[in-house]
Amino acid sequence: MHTSTDPMHTLHDSVSLSPPLIKSSRGGSSIGNGIGCSASSRTAAADAMSMGCDDSDIEPSSMGGSGAAGGNGDGSGSSGGPLVKPPYSYIALITMAILQSPHKKLTLSGICDFIMSRFPYYKDKFPAWQNSIRHNLSLNDCFIKVPREPGNPGKGNFWTLDPLAEDMFDNGSFLRRRKRYKRAPTMQRFSFPAVFGTLSPFWIRKPVPLVPVHFNVPNFNGSREFDVVHNPADVFDSALRADKKFNFFANAEASFYQGSQSGDKFDRLPFMNRGRGADVLDALPHSSGSGGGVGGGSESSRGSKYKSPYAFDVATVASAAGIPGHRDYAERLSAGGGYMDLNVYNDDADTEADAEAEGDDDSCEDKIDVESGNEQEDSHISDSVDSACTNRLDAPPEALIFEASAEASDSSPRRRFDSEPLVLRTSKQSSAKDFRIETLIGHHLHRGGSQEETSD
C-alpha cells in the first residue's frame, strides 16, 4: 500500500493508521501519533481543515470578519452580533437628514426613513425612537415647521433648519454642538394680524440714523430752532401720511403762520376789530422800544407785552382808539395787575361797524320811540333824540355832567369825578345819560301840552 506523509492524502485515505485529527477552537494544529512531521507542516494541515469545515460556529473577530461576517463602518455588527448605537444626538441626526434633502426640508416620516437607511441600529429599534425625533423637532428653536402648500397633497408638515442655526456645530462636526440655539423674538408675529397690520411698517422698517435736523417753527415773536433726532418723514410711512392718519397739523390754518410781519398775523385773529381796529393797528409803532401810551415808557410797555399773550401794548391800542377809561387801564398794567380782555371794547366796535355797513340807525341803543297824539310833535321828539344820540352821547361821558369847555381845577367837581373809582364813574355816566334823555322827552311833552292849551 502506498503510504504518504501528505496530510491531504491522509484525510482521503479509507484505511489509515493515523488517529483522528483534533480541531482547535482558534485554528489549532492537528496532532498525529506515529507521524514524524515538523511544526510547520502541522499548522498548514490545521488551516486546510478549517477551510473545509462549516463556519456557523465561528465567532467574528473583534476587528471584524471577512465577507458577510464583517460589520459596516456605521458602528453596526453582523446580522448575528450586537448593534452599536451611533454617537450622534437626535438634533444631529435630524440636521443630517434635512441638509441632505434636495429642498432642505423633510417631513417626520422622511427624517425617520433617512436615519433608518443610514444607521441600521435605528432600523432594528424602530419605532421606539420615533417619538424622540418628534419631541426634538417641536422643542428646539433650530427647527422650523413649514406648512404644506395647497397644491402639494400629503400628510404632515415639513420641517426645515433655521438659517441662523446652520453653524451650531463646531467646524461642521455633528459630534460637537455649541450651546442650545435660541431664536430671537420677531415683532412681525402677532396673534391678530388684522389689528396690528396697519402699525407694522413702524417696527419692520430699518432704524433711522440719528442725524440732527434743524427746522424753523414760526411763532408770534419770531423763529426758533428745534433739534430733533430725525426727520418726521423718516418715521411715518408715506401711505399713512397720504391718508392723513398721523398728520397732526392737517386741520391747522397754515396761512396763519406764513406771514412775516406781526400786523399780518393779527389781522387774521378773530378777536381783532375789523372796522376801527385796522386803523388803530396801522397807527401803532412797530418797534417795541418806543414809548407806549399813557401809563409808562418803554420799560412798562415791554413788561406788559411779555405779561400779555398778545404781542402789542394794550394800553397803546386803547389810547389810540379813544376807548374811555384807558388811563385807568394803563395804571393797572403798570402796577402789575396783569392784562384784561379786549373783547369788552371790541364788542361795541363790531356792533357799530356792522351798523355802519348796513346803513341803518338802529345801532344806537339809546334811541327811544315815543307815541303821542300829534305826529308833528313825534317827529320833533325823534329828531331831538337822534341828535342827542349822534352828537351828545358820542362825546366823552364826562361831558354829560360837565361842560367840555369848562376848565378843570383842583377843587372842581370834574377833578373829583376823575379821581373816583371806575365803577362809580360808569354808574354816574349811565344815570346822567338817562337823565338827559328823560329831561329831553319831558321838555317836548311839556311844549306839546302848552301848544294844545293855546290852540284851545
UniProtKB/Swiss-Prot annotation:
Subcellular localization, as worded in the UniProt entry: Nucleus
Tissue: During embryogenesis, expressed in neuroblasts derived from procephalic region, ventral nervous system, thoracic sensory neurons and brain cells.
Main location: nucleus
Single GO biological process annotation from the record: anatomical structure morphogenesis
Compositional bias (Gly residues): 64-80, 289-298
One GO cellular component term noted in the UniProt record for this chain: nucleus
Annotated Acidic residues bias: 351-364
SUPFAM superfamilies given in the database record: Winged helix' DNA-binding domain (SSF46785)
PROSITE patterns: FORK_HEAD_1, FORK_HEAD_2, FORK_HEAD_3
Function description: Involved in development during embryogenesis.
PANTHER family named in the record: FORK HEAD DOMAIN-CONTAINING PROTEIN FD3-RELATED, FORKHEAD BOX PROTEIN
Name of protein: Fork head domain-containing protein FD3
Organism of this sequence: Drosophila melanogaster (Fruit fly)
Lineage per the UniProt record: Eukaryota, Metazoa, Ecdysozoa, Arthropoda, Hexapoda
Chain's gene name: fd59A
